[in-house]
């Protein structure tokens, strides 16, 4: 079994490193040749995971031809806004790989497409060869082999089962799902709500406010999931609620951090600079989610206020207080129907 993880950021590095436990041939591919050389020299990703030594068996390269030769599974750990360009550029090398696993969490701004849709379009492959791995998972804790549970989803449940067996580790339990739409929607939109939670913390609004934002944010995520035909229970699982809780409450969360810094008075640009080159997908997904809500007339007040703070310079305090002045509503959407059977 030969697996290549494309993208040498924190999550790509962590996942590639721990997969060496299985005895497979694992390659980590990075775009920047100079950075890859430094990582190889030190056996440490000083750019995104400083302080963690890499498994001696992990191969690291910037050579795309070597990284794709005789590979069984390609895992993409690439920011969603750059995924399509990466696939276009390297399509000729990726053509012979059997399975493609996305780990990115976002929605493409220009097309409002999910990552699995982008992979299918650009590589011209059937959905049964495409999967998404998602759920509550910080790279540092994965490197430390602390217990976690995540989910792998594919439209073909046999594909999900096959990849589940291959990728599960002694400390990493992977569940399977055939609701790739729900898994990708949950993974993307929770980042926007995490920014809102961070803004609330930055403003010093306390635990009550954050709990309300997380809970009502989950409702907004579910509205979009249902719009696209996902199963509501998926959003209550690891890729939805699980990841939402993690990302909205931890100092390790980039999206929460961006929100907190903005709540404390920094501009978006200043907050992003504090991440030192790391990506907070929620900043971009806020645009995608806002466009989806506008085009489909989906009520998403938290998402819309986050968008206004990030892109229309609305005061963070005014944005969160405006949520309290919305029309009083029933807690459960009046047109919500769900048949358990």
Curated annotation (Swiss-Prot):
Keywords: Cytoplasm, Lipid biosynthesis, Lipid metabolism, NAD, NADP, Nucleotide-binding, Oxidoreductase, Phospholipid biosynthesis, Phospholipid metabolism. It is found in: Cytoplasm. InterPro entries: 6-PGluconate_DH-like_C_sf (IPR008927), 6PGD_dom2 (IPR013328), G3P_DH_NAD-dep (IPR006168), G3P_DH_NAD-dep_C (IPR006109), G3P_DH_NAD-dep_N (IPR011128), NAD(P)-bd_dom_sf (IPR036291). The active site is at 190 (proton acceptor). GO terms for molecular function: glycerol-3-phosphate dehydrogenase [NAD(P)+] activity; NAD binding. One of its GO terms (biological process) is carbohydrate metabolic process. This is Glycerol-3-phosphate dehydrogenase [NAD(P)+]. It comes from Dictyoglomus thermophilum (strain ATCC 35947 / DSM 3960 / H-6-12).
């Amino acid at each position: 079994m030969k697996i290549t993880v494309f993208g040498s950021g924190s999550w790509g590095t962590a996942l590639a490193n721990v997969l060496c436990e299985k005895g497979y041939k694992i390659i980590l591919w990075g775009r920047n040749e100079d950075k890859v050389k430094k990582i190889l020299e030190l056996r440490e990703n000083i750019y995104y995971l400083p302080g963690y030594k890499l498994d001696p068996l992990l191969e690291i390269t910037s050579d795309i031809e070597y990284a794709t030769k005789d590979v069984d599974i390609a895992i993409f750990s690439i920011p969603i806004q750059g995924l399509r360009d990466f696939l276009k550029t390297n399509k000729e090398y990726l053509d012979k790989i059997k399975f493609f696993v996305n780990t990115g969490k976002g929605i493409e701004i220009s097309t409002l497409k999910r990552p699995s849709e982008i992979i299918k379009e650009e590589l011209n492959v059937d959905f049964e060869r495409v999967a998404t791995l998602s759920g509550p998972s910080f790279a540092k804790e994965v490197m430390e082999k602390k217990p976690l549970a995540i989910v792998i989803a594919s439209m073909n449940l046999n594909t999900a089962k096959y990849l589940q067996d291959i990728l599960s580790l002694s400390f990493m339990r992977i569940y399977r799902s055939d609701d790739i739409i729900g898994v990708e929607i949950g993974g993307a939109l929770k980042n926007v709500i995490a920014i809102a939670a961070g803004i609330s913390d930055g403003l010093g609004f306390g635990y009550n406010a954050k709990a309300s934002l997380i809970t009502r944010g989950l409702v907004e995520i579910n509205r979009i999931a249902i719009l696209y035909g996902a199963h509501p229970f998926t959003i209550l699982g690891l890729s939805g609620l699980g990841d939402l809780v993690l990302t909205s409450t931890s100092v390790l969360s980039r999206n929460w951090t961006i929100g907190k810094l903005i709540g404390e008075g920094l501009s978006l640009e200043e907050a992003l600079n504090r991440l030192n080159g790391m990506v907070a997908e929620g900043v971009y997904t806020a645009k995608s989610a806002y466009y989806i809500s506008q085009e489909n007339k989906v009520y998403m007040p938290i998402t819309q206020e986050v968008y206004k703070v990030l892109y229309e310079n609305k005061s963070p305090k005014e944005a969160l207080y405006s949520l309290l002045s919305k029309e009083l509503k029933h807690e459960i959407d009046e047109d919500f129907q769900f048949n358990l059977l």
